């Protein structure tokens, strides 16, 4: 019997909408050297015909550097390229439907925004992480209202109460300068876009973010 994978704690990189695969591969390598454990490939403007080809190259770069790959929204792309899992939002297919399609070993994470009741529903569907945010003002989602950090503490208690192995993920406007309070509040993982990949030194930024975990 195989053991179901566990979503790792630590730095969780989320890509900007980059089309340049060389740039992306180099960034993944640098972030991995700095301690990134998982990457979410998120490209909201990628044309459908290019998506599988790009995702396959991102997977190659991730696995070459010991990084797990999550695909944002598109579980069929995750299935096609053999990604490690998928991140789904409120308007995407349910975790139960995704699990049925991808099988028991796929990692599935969900956006819970600032809604602890939604998190409870998602944990009942066996997700591998529940993500909350935006934690701070974010250029990625400029109109999102920041979420009280106390939601992370509530989420950690909820996970313990349900006996789940799910991780608590914080996302939104996170940088090395504001990361530690989120970990102290209960975040197992920090999902970072601009604070990692738009930094002048990606490896150094990854190391600084990883340092927040002690």
Predicted segment positions?
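Conserved N-terminal beta1-alpha1 strand-loop-helix module at the mouth
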Residues: 1-95, 100-128, 144, 150, ...
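A short, flexible beta-alpha/helix-coil linker loop
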Residues: 135-138
